[in-house]
């Protein structure tokens, strides 16, 4: 897939946000849909992305969340999409694994997929640092699947669901949101690259 490509896309986003607040959300939901429509493109890749998050209370002094992500990239002219346009599962959606190091492989190369899905559940752990209002401890479970190789069906990885569980700390510090997570893979493949600890600056889970 070497060479020069010309791509012009029209991006449309639809965001319906009913969360009570952006950070440390305690109630509400957010539904987001994005589509990239090829206008002038060498391989005419159509991209669709959807995410949904719901926040609720399971018991007193607890906040839990459920989220879903769906992602798809496919050429509308039945051509093979470029490697740079193939899908990978974000590390925020599948903790415990290195970024871009799961899913279909071509030889030694991880090539991503045409389709991706992720489901996440997180729940705060009460009775820890009760006096601190800017720190959240959470238990989480992640599950994801990445599949579809348009140029070689034999490389498909649709039957391999990856999952993990772990603990996370969200700290809303003066310099911005910080996240620390420890994750343990539950289901995996031998070719996957694991990542037990992850630190993020500027984002929380």
Task: Show where each model-derived region lies.
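A short, acidic, flexible beta-alpha connecting loop/helix-capping segment that sits on the rim
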Residues: 183-189
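Outer-membrane beta-barrel transmembrane domain signature
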Residues: 143-165
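A short, conserved beta-to-alpha structural element at the edge of catalytic cores
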Residues: 162-183
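C-terminal outer-membrane beta-barrel translocator/porin domains of Gram-negative envelope proteins
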Residues: 1-135, 139-143, 147-149, 191, ...
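Short amphipathic alpha-helix initiation/capping segments at coil-to-helix junctions
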Residues: 110, 114, 158-162, 171, ...
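Outer-membrane beta-barrel "beta-signal"
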Residues: 11, 169-176, 194-205
């Amino acid at each position: 897939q070497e060479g020069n490509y010309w791509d012009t896309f029209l991006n449309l986003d639809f965001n319906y946000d009913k969360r009570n607040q952006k950070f440390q959300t305690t109630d509400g939901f957010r539904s987001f849909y994005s589509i990239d429509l090829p206008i002038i493109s060498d391989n005419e890749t159509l991209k669709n992305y959807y995410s949904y998050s719901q926040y609720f209370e399971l018991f007193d002094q607890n906040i839990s969340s459920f989220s879903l992500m769906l992602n798809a990239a496919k050429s509308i002219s039945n051509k093979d999409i470029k490697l740079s346009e193939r899908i990978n599962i974000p590390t925020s959606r599948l903790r415990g694994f290195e970024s871009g190091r799961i899913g279909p492989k071509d030889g030694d190369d991880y090539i991503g997929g045409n389709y991706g899905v992720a489901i996440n559940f997180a729940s705060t752990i009460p009775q820890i640092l009760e006096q601190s209002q800017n720190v959240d401890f959470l238990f989480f479970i992640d599950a994801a699947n990445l599949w579809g190789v348009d140029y070689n069906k034999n490389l498909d990885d649709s039957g391999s669901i990856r999952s993990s569980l772990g603990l996370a700390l969200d700290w809303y510090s003066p310099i911005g949101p910080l996240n620390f997570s420890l994750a343990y893979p539950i289901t995996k493949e031998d070719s996957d690259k694991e990542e037990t600890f992850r630190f993020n600056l500027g984002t929380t889970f």
